[in-house]
């Protein structure tokens, strides 16, 4: 989510780049921590997680992830200085990305620490993905970073929309970052003073920076008694409107209350994730705790790629009616009275029965392939065009949204596993598979709730192709058919006699 965005790469906190570039840019993108440690032996400079400094101290590094899978902790222990620094990434639906930091004195002597910690290369809101990928230096010229001294909240924006046309083009949203837990820190908006800090020079607060990559770095003095710790948080969010930014600024007038609200929001997300995984039978108890955790992790990864059926076998009539309307407006108009008269929620079998009573094969086709799926949020390396998706969990009003997107191979692999927990949807997955296949036996490379997608071939790009293949067809369909026969032995024979299936129409022929 930090680089792939909360919805899409256009709404990322850090640049969405290939994994090799993520490793190469570790020194100037993402988390950064510099420490000047005063002990009885003198002043020591320590930069956690900087491998170029491995020869300076004896250190141990650890990476932890909670069992739920939604928190990741980076830890470095300096055995020479008897100090430990760790930070944990977690997420809040209301506040965005939360970076919880802890600095611990493991020794038996007091230490004084000059801390500089924060985030580098923060993307402003509304940064176009294509411009950031192909013209990042140009994007830098548009960057405007500003600090609100009263609350310590920084705004990362574009001075204007990025365009080369003689017309007004405003950019009115901001990425925001603020700090909780440190007493009156000095705040930097870019990385220019890092080298000065390394040389022991004092830090000067920055109120406005233009035309450079944004950063949010806090400088504070920590006094740690033996065995004591200091904790703080950096909280970052993207695509904040003017109203949202003003409201956040107002809330930061009571920082303790904000910290408590963030904790509640994170815990609420934990509970929601646990319930989602539980609905797909992700929790089990065995004599081997690691086996149970491994099963849970497999279930989470499956759901992250394929999604989850939203409310067991309950279906939203409004969402189903909207799906019919988006696929076939004429069909929707023919059955608008029936669709609008449906209960707000009904069981999927009840819906299928009502649809059959209409004696309309087109409506029956759309009804059978309807999948009320949400939550799936797969992203991958951006060098693969089929890995880029918009993961929409809410609509423009903030209401829950049923939506899914995935490349063909991944989505049907994961739906296959999902149907073991939701066997009444097996035939719907089969219908989606068959109806999205082409007459010549191939499949499009991406499938979404709105339909199918295929790649537009670029003759000058040897990696580009038409974007659909047939190599995954037979085995996937065979397994789905076997599952149907296992759970519903009579259903396949009935489906073969019904004229409710179709071929996908794509602008290519093999």
Where are these regions (language model features)?
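Anionic coordination/interaction segments
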Residues: 1-510
């Amino acid at each position: 989510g930090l680089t792939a965005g909360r919805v899409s790469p256009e709404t990322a906190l850090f640049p969405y780049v290939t994994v090799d570039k993520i490793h190469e840019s570790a020194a100037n993108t993402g988390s950064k921590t510099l420490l000047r440690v005063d002990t009885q032996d003198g002043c020591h400079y320590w930069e956690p997680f900087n491998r170029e400094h491995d020869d300076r101290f004896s250190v141990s590094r650890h990476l932890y992830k909670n069992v739920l899978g939604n928190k990741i902790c980076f830890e470095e222990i300096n055995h020479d200085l008897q100090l430990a620094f760790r930070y944990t990434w977690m997420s809040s639906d209301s506040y965005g990305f939360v970076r919880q930091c802890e600095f611990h004195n493991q020794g038996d002597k007091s230490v004084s620490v000059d801390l500089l910690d924060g985030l580098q290369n923060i993307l402003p809101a509304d940064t176009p993905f294509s411009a950031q990928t192909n013209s990042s230096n140009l994007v830098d010229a548009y960057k405007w970073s500003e600090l609100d001294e009263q609350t310590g909240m920084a705004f990362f924006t574009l001075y204007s929309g990025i365009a080369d046309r003689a017309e007004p083009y405003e950019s009115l949203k901001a990425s925001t970052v603020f700090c909780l837990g440190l007493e009156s820190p000095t705040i930097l908006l870019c990385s220019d003073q890092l080298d000065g800090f390394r040389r022991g020079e004092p830090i000067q607060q920055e109120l406005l920076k233009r035309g450079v990559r944004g950063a949010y770095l806090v400088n504070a003095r920590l006094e740690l008694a033996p065995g004591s710790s200091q904790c703080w948080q950096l909280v970052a969010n993207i695509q904040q409107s003017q109203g949202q930014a003003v409201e956040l600024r107002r809330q930061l007038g009571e920082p303790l209350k904000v910290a408590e609200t963030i904790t509640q929001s994170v815990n609420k997300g934990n509970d929601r994730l646990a319930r989602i995984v539980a609905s797909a039978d992700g929790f089990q108890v065995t004599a081997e705790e690691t086996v149970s955790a491994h099963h849970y992790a497999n279930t989470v990864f499956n759901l992250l790629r394929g999604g989850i059926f939203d409310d067991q076998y309950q279906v939203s009539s409004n969402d189903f009616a909207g799906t019919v309307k988006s696929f076939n407006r004429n069909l929707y108009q023919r059955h608008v009275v029936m669709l609008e008269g449906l209960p707000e929620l009904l069981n999927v079998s009840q819906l299928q029965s009502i649809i059959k009573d209409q004696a309309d094969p087109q409506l029956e086709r759309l009804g059978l392939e309807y999948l009320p799926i949400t939550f799936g949020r797969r992203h991958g390396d951006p060098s693969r065009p089929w890995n880029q998706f918009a993961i929409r969990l809410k609509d423009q009003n903030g209401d829950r949204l049923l939506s899914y997107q995935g490349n063909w191979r991944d989505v049907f692999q994961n739906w296959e596993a999902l149907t073991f927990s939701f066997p009444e949807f097996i035939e719907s997955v089969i219908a989606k598979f068959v109806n999205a296949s082409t007459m010549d036996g191939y499949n499009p490379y991406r499938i979404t709730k709105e339909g199918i997608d295929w790649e537009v071939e670029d003759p000058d790009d040897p990696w580009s192709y038409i974007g659909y293949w047939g190599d995954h067809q037979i085995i996937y369909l065979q397994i789905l058919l076997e599952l149907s026969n296992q759970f519903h032995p009579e259903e396949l024979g009935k489906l073969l006699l019904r004229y409710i299936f179709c071929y996908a129409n794509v602008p290519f022929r093999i």
